Design a protein with these regions (language model features):
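Short, charge-patterned binding micro-sites
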Residues: 39-59, 327-331
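A structural-propensity feature for long, helix-poor, extended segments
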Residues: 48-50, 154-179, 313-351
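N-terminal, positively charged regions that mediate nucleic acid binding
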Residues: 1-40, 421, 427-430
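C-terminal catalytic subdomain
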Residues: 271, 276-320, 331-338
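Alpha-helical support elements that line or immediately flank enzyme active sites
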Residues: 8, 12-31, 126-150, 290-314
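Glycine-rich, mobile lid/loop segments that gate access to catalytic sites or pores
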Residues: 6, 66, 73-257, 388, ...
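Internal helix-turn-beta structural module
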Residues: 46, 318, 325-430
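Conserved phosphate/anionic-ligand binding catalytic regions in large, soluble enzymes, centered on
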Residues: 8-10, 14-19, 115-130, 256-281, ...
Length: 430
């Protein structure tokens, strides 16, 4: 019997994502000035206010207020009508030094023996539902909002009422064997200007104006947004959007009040959006604001890198990888692999895990080096998912007080590279 499965995403203007992006932008500035920085930065955003907290060990000095305001401005919160404006919001910092007790468990005389920054479990996942080897429900949810933001920033004349905050949700019908059959429901809630005024002050006139706005936005989503997003996908996905697919746009009827004025945002509150949309397990640790000595982040990236390369190599059609660490210990405590019955090799999942341990050095320092994580690469991860993204080289520019304007070439999303496929095929005899 077929079944339905759903994932959601949120836009860069969602309050929790505003917080994530500020935290990661601050991390990037520390990384560009001192790649050995230890950073744990948390952000809270609310009406007219940003609060920064956390722990840092670094030789760098960064302008926290300027960074926060730049991020807010780039997202699009640049009008006083939003009640959260880059130029007028307050920015308070309570960031202080890192605990010496934590640091003594991480730093070692030999860098390769660097201990894990904390205990914990981390998961990586890959499947064959999309070209990016990500779940279709989440991939579509991200794509819808990424394109909506692009329209808002680059082609605003098409949907001139758009504001930064938005959410999406995609439900897909799957076969009993777990293959996507059709897109059942798409939900999009997007913040907008109050662009149709009521004829008079009555509640009835307001309801009519609200209904007209909702109808206009729904039509624009159907006519402009959906065709652009579906065109990115193979024909089988395009066919999955059929005449029976339900489209729900701003189901409450109106979404004018939004962003940090509508809801308080916090770093690390969208961990399922950041990862696999509920299709795979999550260890519970958030990513944003954390330097790669925190295995919550770096080991989760390594686990995705392993899972994606295993699937791309043909070892299995679906792979879940779990890693576990103890604080201050370099080697992982355990490595677990689950292929969910989709393996194409004559090995048990436990035997696959043993080969993974032989092929990949999973000590924190080795992960940092292999994936080039001691670099200012994190702001880009903080919206539209950390996984399923296109690895690429870019030059990023930073304004600093100590070194002026700095240009830095980096590789983004290195954990998405399929650079171990040949090695794995050889080791698994494929």
């Amino acid at each position: 019997m077929s079944y339905l499965f759903t994932s959601e995403s949120v836009s860069e203007g969602h309050p929790d994502k505003v917080a994530d992006q500020i935290s990661d932008a601050i991390l990037d500035h520390f990384m560009v000035l001192d790649p050995h920085s230890k950073v744990a930065c948390e952000t809270l955003v609310t009406t007219g206010q940003v609060v920064l907290a956390g722990e840092v060990k670094s030789d760098a000095y960064v302008e926290l207020q300027d960074i926060a305001r730049d991020v807010i401005r780039e997202i699009g919160y640049n009008k006083s009508a939003y009640c959260f404006d880059a130029d007028s919001c307050g920015v308070l910092s309570a960031i202080h030094g890192q605990s010496a007790d934590i640091n003594r468990g991480v730093e070692r005389t030999a860098p390769e023996e660097q201990g894990a920054g904390d205990q914990g479990i981390m998961f990586g996942y890959a499947c064959r539902e999309t070209p990016s080897l990500m779940p279709l429900t989440l991939d579509l949810s991200h794509a819808l909002l990424e394109e909506l933001a692009r329209i808002r920033k680059e082609e605003l004349h098409l949907m001139p009422y758009l504001r930064p905050d938005a959410k999406s949700q995609v439900t897909v019908e799957y076969s009993e064997e777990g293959k996507p059959l059709r897109i059942d429901t798409i939900v999009i809630s997007t913040q907008h200007d109050d662009f149709i005024q009521p004829a008079d002050a009555t509640a009835e006139a307001q309801a009519i104006a609200d209904a007209e706005m909702q109808a206009r936005i729904t039509e624009d989503i159907r006519r402009i947004l959906l065709p652009r997003v579906l065109a990115r996908y193979p024909e089988d996905v395009q066919r999955a959007f059929d005449s029976e697919t339900k489209l729900l746009v701003n189901p409450t009827g109106k979404f004018v009040i939004g962003g940090p004025h509508g809801d308080t945002g916090l770093t690390g509150r969208k961990i399922i959006v950041d990862t696999y949309g509920g299709k795979a397990a999550h260890g519970g640790g958030a990513f944003s604001g954390k330097d790669p000595s925190k295995v919550d982040r770096s080991a989760a990236y390594a686990a995705r890198h392993i899972a994606k390369n295993l699937v791309a190599a043909g070892v299995a059609d679906e792979v879940l990888v779990q890693l576990a660490y103890a604080i201050g210990v370099a080697e992982p405590i355990s490595i677990f692999v689950n292929t969910n019955g989709t393996s194409h090799v004559s090995l048990s999942d436990a035997e696959i895990a043993k080969l993974v341990d032989e092929v990949f050095d999973l000590r924190p320092y080795a992960i940092e080096q292999r994936l080039k994580l001691r670099a200012p690469i994190y702001r880009e991860t903080a919206s539209y998912g950390h996984f399923g993204r296109e690895p690429r080289k870019v030059t990023k520019y930073f304004s600093t007080n100590s070194r002026g304007d700095v240009a830095h070439e980096v590789e983004l999303f290195t954990w998405e590279k399929l650079d171990y496929v040949d090695t794995l095929r050889q080791r698994f005899g494929l």
